[in-house]
Amino acid sequence: MSKSIEKFPKELVSPIAQLHSLVEKNSKLHIKELFAAEQDRFQNYSVKFDQLVFDYSKHRITKSVLEQLFALAKTKQLTHWIERLFSQDKVNCTEQRAAMHWALRLPSEYSKFPELTKQVHTQLQRMYALVEKIHAGQYRGATGEVIQDVVNIGVGGSDLGPQMVTHALCDFKVKTAKPLNVHFVSTMDGSQLSDLLHQLRPETTLFIISSKSFGTIDTLSNAQTVRQWLEKALGKHDRVVKSHFIGVSTKAEKMTEWGIAPENQLLLWDWVGGRYSLWSCIGFPIALTIGIDGFQQLLAGAHAVDEHFQNTSFEQNIPVLMALLGIWNNNFLNIQTHAVLPYDGRLKYFAAYLQQLEMESNGKSVQRDGQKVELDTCPIVWGEVGPNAQHAFYQLLHQGTQAVSCDFIAPIQRYNADHFTYVENAEALIEQHHLALSNCLAQSRLLAFGNEALDSAELKNLPIYKQYEGNQPSSTLLLKELNPYSLGMLIALYEHKVFVQSVIWNINPFDQWGVEKGKQIADQLLPILNGAQNDLSALDASTRGLIKILLGKVDG
């Protein structure tokens, strides 16, 4: 946004004025000074809940800052908005819909919303039945062979969430009657499919078409390609489509029209946003990988956080704290980029998942009342598995000119379960896990304390280009271990963080109008590239020039 616009107009509300005052008062305060002044700072600025610990002591905050952030949340009626979210209110104001992803993880015996719970569990039970059938080797393709490969075709929320969770929980893959592999395809250019189809047998491959609207061109173009691949190998008859495709969508009629058998149609609802949908039948690939019990544990972990979010005071409420720390960094300290750094290779796709969750939800510039925002909203979210990131962009974090806030994420335990395939190598692998943990702690320490973290003797003659300023804020999330339950907790924490920030910024986190128009313009350009239309006069000079090169009318 323009530098002339205040991050928060100072005159609006008392907590905002107080926070601006605290910024000016503490502008030169270093994180190392906060720790020096408060010996029990870790105890005062960390929360333990269930299977995780949230340490936010390495942020540039004081008790006074926290008090005013809580006061800001109260002036924005955060408690009221949380109550609205967990009702059936239409908190998605631009589409006049509720946002009830939390309902997808309600226990079957939950009594507050009996009809809603029944709808959700009816679809989950249908999904579980298919999972059991595939696992038992009883689901067969058109030629009678057992399915051994399942390909999820989706994009955005129908791809990022399921792929992230499936990869993260690879240690919990269940045994099946015959080996079962799950794959993911999302890109509309066909490159992923081209590589994958060479490895698969049509007779033993099942495809999931995962699309809330069943109209997304990325997904349907890939689906049409694999349909042709199947029909070329197995023949053009209804049995091929009915045996080799499962659909997940809100649009039963569109799935039927495409040829998907009713018994292979799993339903969603309009009140589930795509980026919040992995808890639903969109999570079919997850259930295929970790089994029904594992999937239910994933839901249970998220539900535990739902209860924590609704029933815990702001002072101990982890999603609220995560959100308010982000507000402080973004809107008051002018830190507008946030790195997510998991120190576990299984969380390889977690940063990409959060990019959609946070930036598609809160990357908005219009308030709920239709007025332009008067403050910066979502920061740029990025990240990578921590040990790899250390050899890529940590140079910028430590010695660059950009202020960056970070989330460090790590499991406390790993390689200690006897059902894992690597149990015979556990001792060596545990040492590697400790190596990752030591790096996680070292990096957060160095980012916070800078030169203070170095040995004084070493620092004495250290040239300036080897020195560290520090004062880069970070949180650390420690999971007891990375399992379905704790991962469900972790994801739900970030979901609710996003919601809290949307309340403070007065924006709608449940729509994504910014992604719509580009698709429509692409539809207008496609006939030109296909040769069905020649008139370029309505286009800008750049687009005209690029199209001429693509059509071979001028040299590139």
UniProtKB/Swiss-Prot annotation:
Localisation per UniProt entry: Cytoplasm
Gene3D superfamilies for the chain: 1.10.1390.10, Glucose-6-phosphate isomerase like protein, domain 1
Disulfide bond sites: none
Pathway: Carbohydrate biosynthesis; gluconeogenesis; Carbohydrate degradation; glycolysis; D-glyceraldehyde 3-phosphate and glycerone phosphate from D-glucose: step 2/4
EC assignment: 5.3.1.9
Active-site residues from the entry: E360 (proton donor), H391, K519
One term under GO cellular component: cytosol
Record field: catalytic activity: alpha-D-glucose 6-phosphate = beta-D-fructose 6-phosphate
Domain of life: Bacteria
Role, per record: Catalyzes the reversible isomerization of glucose-6-phosphate to fructose-6-phosphate.
PANTHER family: GLUCOSE-6-PHOSPHATE ISOMERASE (PTHR11469:SF1)
Name of the protein this chain belongs to: Glucose-6-phosphate isomerase
Source organism of this protein record: Acinetobacter baumannii (strain ATCC 17978 / DSM 105126 / CIP 53.77 / LMG 1025 / NCDC KC755 / 5377)
